[in-house]
A protein has these predicted regions:
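N-terminal loops that bind phosphate or other acidic moieties
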Residues: 2-136, 140-382
Length: 382
């Protein structure tokens, strides 16, 4: 029997790698003669960087770059070799340009810059990356990726050919996008952007109106931010010949989705699709007899491009049953049945506090895994 152990991280308590090892040890205990394959999984959100580096035996790097407020931050990123021996850099923009890097009182979407994310791209290329996977969740910025573009040599000039500064309210002074100093090392680099939203760049469902409030913008400021993104979108169309205003996902990360398409020719794809393709997961699981997955909580959100649901859907394609283990159940957890997670259990086995459950997560996962696996063994013997 071949068993795939493929959990996501249990947020706040266990990494995907830790969860994979615990469940694998339990499976080896109950099914000692089985073939076990551990595949820590992620969907492009928090923890994706470490999960991918662990899964590929890649290298976790740290670089000093500009943060969203132009102060220096130490940002982690990774580099690894794919199974096709392609060197890939993996970057989460939140590490360099994220909301979590700023105190609430310092949130400022007019001045927050994505420049540091561009610096991380350059570090990855300098270290040999031929492809970049960029996760763009959790941004503090609303600059349409102009900071990233500036970091790689693209200039944004006014009517007198002077560079315009990074304040978004000044973007209407930009009259020309100049690519003369664009870093030539990037011309042959492939970019994939993990993007799980469909918001366009501008309008009531765009970057500024939907995400501006969480970045510190009030209603009047949101109008200004949106107006300036519209201006930049039209300028990109005029100077670069690319219409980013109608791109689904263009409004992600304060317009970075649109900027990555315009300046780098990036492809915007659901994060889980990028990760699963990169790790060649479908090929690895298609001859399995059982899949075990898990995450911190199973609820209705688990059905939206989350890694456990994605691997269960692959299992369903090949008639492989999937069982799931989660920290807890939330509203809508039962809907996972139709996605292929046919049996589910939680780590919680007695009345206890959240802190206790988090602190004891390793032991709780061990108990839950053993009980699930023993039930499977009983069923096999009926």
């Amino acid at each position: 029997m071949k068993i795939i152990i493929a959990p996501q991280s249990f947020k706040g308590s266990l990494t995907a790698k830790e969860a994979t090892k615990i469940i694998s040890d339990c499976a080896r205990n109950i099914f000692p003669d089985s073939e076990l394959l551990g595949i820590p999984i992620a969907d492009g959100g928090d923890g994706t960087l470490e999960t991918i580096i662990d899964a590929t035996n890649g290298k976790l790097m740290n670089s000093q770059v500009k943060g969203p407020d132009n102060s220096f931050v130490k940002a982690s990123w990774g580099i690894f070799n794919s199974e096709k021996n392609e060197k890939i850099g993996i970057i989460e923009m939140a590490r360099a340009s994220g909301l979590a890097l700023l105190e609430p009182k310092k949130l400022d979407p007019f001045n927050a810059t994505s420049f540091g994310t561009g610096e991380l791209i350059l570090h990855a290329v300098k270290n040999g990356a031929k492809k970049i996977i960029l996760g763009i969740g959790g941004s503090a910025t609303n600059d349409c990726g102009i900071g990233v573009a500036k970091a790689v040599g693209i200039k944004f000039l006014d009517s007198k050919n002077n560079e315009v500064n990074d304040n978004v309210s000044n973007f209407s002074n930009i009259k020309k996008i100049n690519l003369d100093n664009f870093d030539t090392r990037l011309k042959d680099i492939k970019f994939e952007v993990a993007c799980d939203v469909t918001n366009k760049l501008c309008g009531n469902e765009g970057a500024s109106y939907i995400y501006g409030p969480q970045k510190g913008a009030d209603p009047e400021e949101i109008k200004i931010l949106d107006k300036n993104l519209l201006y930049i979108g039209n300028l990109i169309k005029k100077d670069l010949g690319i219409n980013v205003l109608n791109i689904k996902g263009g409004g992600a990360a304060g317009g970075l989705g649109a900027g990555m398409v315009a300046f780098f020719g990036a492809k915007l794809k659901p994060g889980v699709d990028i990760i699963f393709e990169t790790l060649n997961i479908e090929e690895k699981i298609k001859d399995a007899n059982l899949i075990i997955t898990g995450e911190g909580q199973f609820d209705i959100s688990s059905t939206y491009n989350k890694a456990p649901t994605a691997i269960a859907k692959l299992g369903k394609k090949y008639d492989i049953p999937t069982i799931g283990i989660s920290g807890s159940f939330g509203d809508g957890f039962e809907k996972l049945d139709k996605f292929g997670i046919l049996s589910k259990t939680t780590l919680i086995n007695k009345i206890s506090s959240l802190d206790d459950n988090i602190n004891n997560a390793k032991e709780l996962l061990k108990v839950a895994s053993l009980e699930q696996l023993k039930a499977i063994k009983i069923g096999m013997n009926l």
